[in-house]
Amino acid sequence: LKFKNLQFHALGTDTWYANIGPNHPLYHASEVTMEKLLPHPFVRLPDDYFSNLSFYLEIDGVRLEQFKRVVYVNDSAAILSLLRSTDVVRLGPGLSAPDFAEYGIRTIPIRNCQVQINVGWIQRSREMLSTEAQAFVKMLEELYPKNEK
């Protein structure tokens, strides 16, 4: 980043959780394991140029490619609909928990999840933020208050 005259402003860290709807047998679990999730369909967006999660992501010794039933969708509304009406599982950050909870979807910790997501924003060095950009950064900072991890 320094070479490109960019600065990273850290907001916080997160990890991955299992998003599970009311038709999933593990809906009331306080914690899940990847082994217990494997028999269920996994819903996700397709990998893109910048994210190739299928080949490198591993949680507690289980790689995403080990899911035998994967449902690829092209938008978040389809994910939400499937989570609400079937036994699919989605993996994602805890930040989205309040949004999913509005629709009766639980965000459940995954045992031994070593995934760490560093959340932040990037700014050009020596460049002032516009009023709109400052407001957006403030909104982001409210999602990751300084007094948390």
Predicted stretch roles:
Residues 1-5, 29, 98-103:
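Short loop/helix-cap segments at secondary-structure boundaries that form the rim of catalytic
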Residues 1-16, 20, 58, 106-108:
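Short beta-strand-centered segments that line the small-molecule binding cleft or hinge
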Residues 1, 22, 49, 92-96, ...:
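Short secondary-structure boundary segments
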Residues 26-30, 34, 38-63, 94, ...:
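Secondary-structure junction motif
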Residues 28, 106-149:
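A late-sequence structural motif
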Residues 47-107:
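Hydrophobic hinge/microswitch elements
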Residues 9, 35, 80-81:
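Alpha-helical segments flanking ligand/cofactor-binding loops in enzyme cores
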Residues 17-19, 25, 43, 89, ...:
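Residues embedded in well-ordered beta-strands
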